[in-house]
Amino acid sequence: MKYLGIDYGTKRTGVAASDTGGSMAFPRRTIVMTTRDRFFAELLAVAEEERAEAYVVGLPLLHDGTDTLTTRQVRNFVERLKRRTTLPVYLMEEFLSSYEAEDDLRDAGLSGRALEAVVDQQAAVRILQSFLNLPESRRTPA
């Protein structure tokens, strides 16, 4: 099964895709938020280009598992996505994926605009790869 991983943000959203076997995640693009309609049009177009069969959205939680403002924004995004697609949508709990991706990219020598261009994609890769590493029995659609 092919999955599309999403690191949702109100300004930029990172997108990753799995291989067709659903075992490895790869960065695909960063979608910059302009209008909601354009954002969803671009996201759905990426899903079609990739022939995705499901979405995996990172759900940021605090250490103790409680929601934050960002968690609520992601949940709202997921509800809007589900109204626009027939594909299943999965939530993957995550903590600090964007910060960890940024640290890794800085260690690789990226900074400034070069870093900004790919950090959200790398966070999406982390989210999707974590999901792909789960046993299928632990994957439940939102």
UniProtKB/Swiss-Prot annotation:
Primary role: Could be a nuclease involved in processing of the 5'-end of pre-16S rRNA.
SUPFAM superfamilies recorded: Ribonuclease H-like
GO biological process, one term: rRNA 5'-end processing
A molecular-function term among this protein's GO annotations: nuclease activity
The protein's Enzyme Commission number: 3.1.-.-
Pfam family, one: RuvX
CDD domains reported for this sequence: YqgF
Compartments reported by the entry: Cytoplasm
Family the entry assigns: Belongs to the YqgF nuclease family.
Protein name: Putative pre-16S rRNA nuclease
Keyword annotations of the record: Cytoplasm, Hydrolase, Nuclease, Ribosome biogenesis
Matching NCBIfam families: RNAse_H_YqgF
Predominant subcellular localization, coarse grouping: cytoplasm
Entry-linked SMART domains: YqgFc
Gene Ontology CC terms, in alphabetical order: cytosol
Keyword Hydrolase: yes
